[in-house]
């Protein structure tokens, strides 16, 4: 049968400038307003602001727009601290006061949880409280620290331009182009001090064209520099690089491939946490905010209400950032991670800190982990700290273990809200919810939620107001 071509109708986006008033921020820091009963997302606008905008992406349920002109500014709007804020893609909330950022993120987190998990939460509440009116959950005071110079990890892009000049900096907003960075207001001060000599080194290398990107880390035993390169350095370039490492007293790694790194100068980096020493590789994930990480681990320990007889399961455990501090208060902690190398690192860290009650295993966390050998003994407390994609694959298996308490640490409130529904449908109560100010000046939102089995919920509840 012959098939006839039927051209699809071209969707025409209305590009006329429209006036909009912003009501709130979403969980990524974009302003939300409404036109013709449709939600419009606009980067760079704050609640209460009025602006002329132009639609850039028109969907059936929502649209995105860009600012043409601000007409009314919010009292919370401030001058960005960074001179290249309008160009750099690293931060997107420097135009909002730090207090305003914290309040907006806390509200966005609460709104998401009420929207996506509220129905199940209300059902559990009514069943347990005899239809009495009460708060859905305790919204605790956000964990905050310094608003500037908090970031102990950063990745810088390097490119030899057509004009022969070396570009060294961060990616521009919504672009692969590089904006040159001399100083960064969210980068740790010790790493900012390293930028001028590092730029000078890179500019003198003959192999500039073969540079990949540069990673900087502030470890507790020194500054770490990782140089990725596509071809081997010449002997002359290697001499310059080693001289730089010695003069600046940095821990230097070279990475000829995405998988291989080589320690060239200095010792294995580590950071201290709760009187523990955690060694890591530049390839490993560590939390970027040292102070918030410390408070976050303390809060997780408190929320789990650890007892000497507890057996704790730490899923997505990484190199032991939660597992090892938790092991100081529990009978046993089992950490599970999908990456072999991280499991090896966590095991070494447990041995280094003489924590014999912490053991680590590699497993695919999308599969039924309850069938694995280490899950034969029961766990009464569970902690999860997944990546942005969340823990959809493991949630059904978490409830099979029937823990008394579950602490979920999230870097994406949307997946936290989604995954929470599994626990709520199985009779767990969302007891506490808190925002962790891990990434000031950006729209990234870290959070922590506590779920408790219905029979373990205490009758007295205190709701913390911001």
Curated annotation (Swiss-Prot):
Q: Where does [4Fe-4S] cluster bind?
A: 82, 88, 91, 184
Q: Which GO terms describe its biological process?
A: rRNA base methylation
According to its UniProt record, the EC number is 2.1.1.190
The UniProt record lists the TRAM domain at 11-69
Q: InterPro entries of this UniProt entry? A: 23S_rRNA_MeTrfase_RlmD, MeTrfase_TrmA_AS, MeTrfase_TrmA_CS, NA-bd_OB-fold, SAM-dependent_MTases_sf, TRAM_dom, U5_MeTrfase_fam
Q: Which UniProt keywords apply?
A: 4Fe-4S, Iron, Iron-sulfur, Metal-binding, Methyltransferase, rRNA processing, S-adenosyl-L-methionine, Transferase
- Described function: Catalyzes the formation of 5-methyl-uridine at position 1939 (m5U1939) in 23S rRNA.
Similarity section: Belongs to the class I-like SAM-binding methyltransferase superfamily. RNA M5U methyltransferase family. RlmD subfamily.
Q: What protein does this entry describe?
A: 23S rRNA (uracil(1939)-C(5))-methyltransferase RlmD
Q: Which gene encodes it?
A: rlmD
């Amino acid at each position: 049968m012959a098939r006839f071509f039927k051209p699809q109708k071209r969707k025409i986006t209305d590009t006329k400038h429209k006036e909009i008033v912003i009501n709130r921020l979403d969980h990524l820091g974009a302003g939300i307003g409404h036109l013709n009963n449709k939600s419009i997302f606009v980067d760079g606008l704050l609640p209460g602001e009025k602006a002329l905008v132009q639609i850039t992406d028109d969907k059936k349920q929502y649209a995105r727009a860009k600012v043409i002109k601000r007409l009314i500014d919010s009292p919370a709007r401030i001058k960005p601290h960074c001179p290249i804020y309008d160009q750099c893609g690293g931060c997107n909330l420097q135009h909002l006061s730090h207090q305003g950022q914290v309040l907006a993120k806390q509200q966005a987190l609460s709104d998401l949880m009420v929207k996506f998990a509220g129905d199940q939460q209300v059902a559990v509440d009514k069943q347990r409280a005899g239809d009495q009116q009460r708060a859905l959950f305790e919204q605790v005071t956000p964990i905050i620290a310094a608003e500037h110079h908090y970031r102990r990890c950063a990745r810088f892009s390097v490119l030899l331009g057509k004009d022969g000049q070396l570009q060294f900096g961060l990616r521009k907003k919504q672009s692969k182009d590089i904006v040159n960075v001399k100083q960064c207001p969210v980068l740790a001060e010790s790493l900012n001090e390293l930028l001028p000599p590092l730029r000078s080194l890179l500019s003198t290398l003959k192999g500039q064209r073969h540079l990949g990107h540069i990673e900087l880390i502030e470890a507790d035993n020194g500054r770490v520099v990782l140089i990725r390169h596509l071809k081997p350095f010449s002997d002359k370039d290697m001499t310059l690089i080693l001289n730089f490492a010695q003069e600046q007293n940095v821990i230097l790694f070279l990475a000829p491939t995405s998988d291989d790194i080589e320690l060239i100068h200095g010792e294995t980096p580590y950071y201290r946490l709760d009187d523990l020493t955690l060694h890591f590789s530049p390839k490993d994930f560590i939390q970027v905010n040292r102070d918030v990480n410390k408070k976050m681990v303390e809060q997780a320990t408190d929320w789990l209400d650890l007892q000497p007889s507890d057996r704790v399961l730490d899923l997505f455990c990484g190199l032991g950032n939660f597992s090892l501090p938790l092991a100081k208060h529990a009978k046993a902690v089992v950490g599970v991670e999908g990456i072999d190398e991280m499991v090896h690192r966590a095991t070494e860290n447990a041995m280094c800190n003489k924590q014999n009650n912490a053991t680590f295993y590699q497993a695919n966390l999308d599969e039924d982990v309850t069938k694995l050998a280490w899950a034969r003994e029961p766990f009464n407390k569970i902690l999860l700290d997944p990546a942005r994609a969340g823990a959809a694959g493991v949630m059904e298996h978490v409830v099979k273990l029937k823990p008394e308490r579950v602490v979920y640490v999230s870097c994406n409130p949307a997946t936290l809200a989604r995954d929470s529904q599994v626990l709520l449908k199985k009779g767990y109560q969302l007891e506490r919810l808190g925002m962790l100010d891990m990434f000031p000046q950006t729209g990234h939102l870290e959070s922590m939620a506590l779920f408790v089995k219905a029979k373990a919920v205490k009758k007295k509840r205190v709701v913390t107001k911001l």
